[in-house]
């Protein structure tokens, strides 16, 4: 079994799960990973250390872990001194997790809360304390919806560090105009800055997936450059969906129905300093926000518009 040493401020060492123990636990539970739930469990201690180190969490953090599975990442997060709320949709795994933690370090169990829930329905009033960070090996099938839901539902979250399918990682971190740039790229930047932090080999998981994973970190803007209320966010996201739903069209043509006419669409775009001949796939989150707010200035929205400062690109190095 692998182990990880705590910082000098605490002498406790928590044993991490290795491949042998993960298989033993699965056999004990008569558990077979379900592809429909994206159940691939990380068993490599170095990978777990890397994820936790990238997250930067400490004993002052309340970490929300999505899909803890058999507990590999959970143990490492507890070893950093953090409080962890683990959200697990599988009832068998949710029931077993506290016992696994107790077997590895009984004194840490008091800092663990397990919720047998679908993360997409999780609400802030279900948690005793607001989470400050998300650290997770996200199931491939819900990665983007889960990220957007958590960032919107929990404004207290300052950082998000997740392993996702490599293709999803590329899309999240893509820049305007790139072939991978799309709806997830824009929407996640409504909340913060995004950076890819490297690749993760399929061989560190059980069962071994067919694709590589990517490590991604999102840092929420310390002060949001624009309003963050749900109504404003929905209006911005509506524009994003319109633009990428017709990504081969010019912005002028894509926004005709939204603006009411081609001329009005062009006028709104020009008011936002956007060339109507551009395509939606070249617009940044700043452009979409500015388009909505300038439209409000023209009477095209029920919100008074103000020009946001730029959100900037990139994020702190991983």
Curated annotation (Swiss-Prot):
**What parts of the sequence cross the membrane?**
none
Task: Output the InterPro entries linked to this UniProt entry.
Answer: KsgA/Erm (IPR001737), rRNA_Ade_diMease-like_C (IPR023165), rRNA_Ade_Mease_Trfase_CS (IPR020596), rRNA_Ade_methylase_Trfase_N (IPR020598), rRNA_adenine_dimethylase (IPR011530), SAM-dependent_MTases_sf (IPR029063)
Q: Name one Pfam family in it.
A: RrnaAD
| Chain intervals for the UniProt region annotation (Disordered) | 296-318
Q: Which GO terms describe its cellular component?
A: cytosol
Key words of the record:
Cytoplasm, Methyltransferase, RNA-binding, rRNA processing, S-adenosyl-L-methionine, Transferase
Query: Reaction(s) catalyzed by this protein?
Result: adenosine(1518)/adenosine(1519) in 16S rRNA + 4 S-adenosyl-L-methionine = N(6)-dimethyladenosine(1518)/N(6)-dimethyladenosine(1519) in 16S rRNA + 4 S-adenosyl-L-homocysteine + 4 H(+)
Q: Which gene encodes it?
A: rsmA
Q: Where is the composition biased (Basic and acidic residues)?
A: 296-305
Superkingdom to which the source organism belongs: Bacteria
Q: Name one GO molecular function term.
A: RNA binding
Where in the cell does this protein reside?
Cytoplasm
Describe the family membership recorded for this protein in Swiss-Prot or TrEMBL: Belongs to the class I-like SAM-binding methyltransferase superfamily. rRNA adenine N(6)-methyltransferase family. RsmA subfamily.
Q: Which organism is it from?
A: Mycobacterium avium (strain 104)
Q: What does this protein do?
A: Specifically dimethylates two adjacent adenosines (A1518 and A1519) in the loop of a conserved hairpin near the 3'-end of 16S rRNA in the 30S particle. May play a critical role in biogenesis of 30S subunits.
EC id: 2.1.1.182
Entry binding sites for S-adenosyl-L-methionine: 40, 42, 67, 88, 118, 137
Q: What is this protein called?
A: Ribosomal RNA small subunit methyltransferase A
The cross-references to HAMAP family, in alphabetical order and at most eight, read: 16SrRNA_methyltr_A
Alphabetized SUPFAM superfamilies for the sequence:
S-adenosyl-L-methionine-dependent methyltransferases
